[in-house]
Amino acid sequence: MLLQASQATQSVWKTLNKWLPPLSRDKDWWWKTLGPQINTLLTEADYDLNERYEALLLLYRWVVPEMGPRPRSSVAPSKSFMTDDHSPIEYSWKWISGNKKPEIRYAVELVSPLAGSKQDPFNQIPTRNLVYNLAKIIPELDLTWFEHFWHELLGPGSPTTSTSGVLTKGSTVFAALEMLHGHLSVKVYFIPVETPDFSAWHQIKHAIEASGCPNLEALNHVDAYLSSHDDGRQLRPFMLAIDLVEPAASRLKIYARSNQTSFRFVRDVMTIGGLRTDLDRSIEKFSDLWKRALGLDPDTPPEDELPKVDHLTSGAVFNFDVAPKSQIPEVKAYIPVRHYANNDLQAALGLIGYLEDHGHGGYSQSYLRGLDMLAPSGQLDQATGVQTYFAVACQGEDLSLTSYLNPQFYAAFQEPERT
């Protein structure tokens, strides 16, 4: 049974909406849709008043004006990589151990009015402008690696310029705004355009090697795993993410996908083929969470594959952090609840049951209220789609967990996918 949200939840957004200058029709729709959603998530995660005002003003000033046309049908005008229905924004809720306040983030692909044209064939201009504008306001942002990886992966000589007359089917860059309690952190994702001669992995690896990174040991471990290990060869890298901080402090996250879905495979990737040997206890916990989140029988053998799903984003997803501060990559796996759970409520209750059993369930009802706010009315226990992934990283004997949430702006025009 969901607890009812406080009547005061939207007071911050209502105050801002009352006094901020009016927006044009499309921008007004985005503001009146995203604003209450973000405000609800921040309120449920116990962000203080000033943090909520700042997050909403950032949204109003720098994000909403570049969101593009409002949804008018099930067909998105820009095929954003962000979500399965091409909604250009995805929220995340990071669970903090010890019942501490969760952290809220959203990743967003801004939409250029020139997207698909010769001037901006890969819809890159607004994200680049967002980064530059935020850097003027937040002096701690460091653009050293942003400039480097933009040049290497999207700049002159990259496939995005050599094929600039061709319309892209997907995204090449987007940003994430991490609203940590007390400050804002920014991350940028690069998705190289693959060609017959240059895979995404080839481009990402070369860009990291050319970055001046003082320690490539973690990268070399990933390269060896991908090329020489049976399970590693089942992975296809497709994206790189960096933090906008000084390079020595930044993460370097290489994202990879596989159509393999057994927990045995997931365990092998998490340990990098046995390279990491200190994860037995956390992997045991991960196995328990995997079964709960996906509604599997507790006795399901780790060799069993999940049911086959024919979709571009089906399968398992991972990221490898090859930052210079690490000699062995940190690995994160993404439980694909969007495609394999029974419904959103089942997946959420599986996650919450795990958290409560391990003493981390203090924000369970807050999370459920957030889901209820995002889900189409009456659909939380009828379909999947709001929760896309549960991200899992092994930290000592415990797990670090993050839920990813899709507001489904375009799916709202479709018949729900009932399970």
From Swiss-Prot:
Coiled coil: none annotated. Dimethylallyl diphosphate binds at residues 105, 187, 189, 251, 253, 255, 332, 334. It catalyses: L-tyrosine + dimethylallyl diphosphate = 4-O-dimethylallyl-L-tyrosine + diphosphate. (2E)-geranyl diphosphate binds at residues 105, 187, 189, 251, 253, 255, 332, 334, 404. InterPro entries: Aro_prenylTrfase (IPR033964), Aro_prenylTrfase_DMATS (IPR017795), DMATS-type_fun (IPR012148). L-tyrosine binds at residues 81, 257, 389. GO terms for molecular function: transferase activity, transferring alkyl or aryl (other than methyl) groups. Pfam families: Trp_DMAT. Disruption phenotype: Impairs the production of r-N-DMAT and ac-r-N-DMAT. Induction: Expression is negaticely regulated by the global nitrogen regulator areA. Keywords: Transferase. One of its GO terms (biological process) is alkaloid metabolic process. It is an enzyme of class 2 (transferase). Its EC number is 2.5.1.-, 2.5.1.122. Changing residue 389 to A: Reduces the catalytic activity when DMAPP and L-Trp are used as donor and acceptor, respectively; and almost abolishes the activity when GPP is used as a donor or L-Tyr as an acceptor. The keyword Amino-acid biosynthesis does not apply. L-tryptophan binds at residues 81-82, 90, 257, 389. PANTHER family: INDOLE PRENYLTRANSFERASE TDIB-RELATED, PRENYLTRANSFERASE ASQH1-RELATED. Dimethylallyltryptophan synthase; part of the DMATS1 gene cluster that mediates the biosynthesis of a reversely N-prenylated monomeric L-tryptophan (r-N-DMAT). DMATS1 catalyzes the reverse N-prenylation of L-Trp with DMAPP to yield N-dimethylallyl-L-tryptophan. DMATS1 exhibits unusually broad substrate specificity and can utilize geranyl diphosphate (GPP) or L-Tyr as an alternative prenyl donor or acceptor, respectively. Is able to catalyze both forward and reverse prenylation, i.e., at C1 or C3 of DMAPP; and it can catalyze C-N and C-O bond-forming reactions. Belongs to the tryptophan dimethylallyltransferase family. This is Dimethylallyltryptophan synthase 1. It comes from Gibberella fujikuroi (strain CBS 195.34 / IMI 58289 / NRRL A-6831) (Bakanae and foot rot disease fungus).
